[in-house]
Amino acid sequence: MPGEPVTPPLFDDKGKSVMARITPDDVGRYVILSVHDPLGYEQDVAEVIAGYMDEARLIADTHMFVTYTGTYHGVPITVCSTGSGAPETEIAMVEFFRFSNADTFIRAGTSGTYLEDIDVGDLVIAAGAVRDEGTSAAYVVPTYPAIANHEVMLAMAEAAHALQIPYHVGITRSTDSCQAGQGRPVLDYLQEDSARIPEYWKKVGIKNFERETSIIYVLCSLFGFRGGAVNAVVNSTPKGNLEVGAGSDSVFRTVLEGIRILAEWDAIKERTGVDFLLPSMIAKRP
């Protein structure tokens, strides 16, 4: 009828996702999302992370997304590599929302920093994210916060601490632009506002900057899932250095160990019949 809303068809191929080619039987409860990132890894990052698992099998390679499912200390985990930025991450997440029973999504990636006290190779566990990307605005107003699930964030911090890996917890800035939008001149050109980006975000204490965390946090909060992010710092503005691959091993070990810890906590919640993890439930008794 004239005037009725018209929507495009959903990406669905007889019960299987079109972009990632996954089904519910293929996917574990915990999903690691990572980017095909030349600043971190020479081979596909899903294959790299799968190599850290006890066992893993290739679910699908669609050129856009590569997906493996395996176990780590008995915990079923799926890892999916995506293209860079919020739009590509959105596509992957919506496919997992619709075609799996996963409820926990954790970014394992790379980032930069404007702060002197964070070194290249350190990890940043994002408690929240600045939404300086456009994709999340398609879902909800700009004042809606992008925040981590507290259980995921604590599990990642617990893992990094146990592994004795240098880490920081704080706010990440997610951008669309990897160049001018992060304060990098292009052929000696930079708008005045862009030139002030490093100093401004340094002043307000943003720990790091990248391109994906905010969309993960917004989508997870909006649709009732758990989101987290652990990013290695591979470039430092104040120190003027970039180190390809810095901290990648630390990120992968932290995220996998963090998921193992989170699975233990989830089991405690299930046994006690509570919805949210409380400190008293995991406190070590003397």
How would you describe each model-predicted region?
Residues 1-90:
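N-terminal short beta-loop-beta anion/metal-coordinating cradle
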Residues 60-286:
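Glycine-rich phosphate- or other oxyanion-binding loops that anchor nucleotides, phosphorylated ligands
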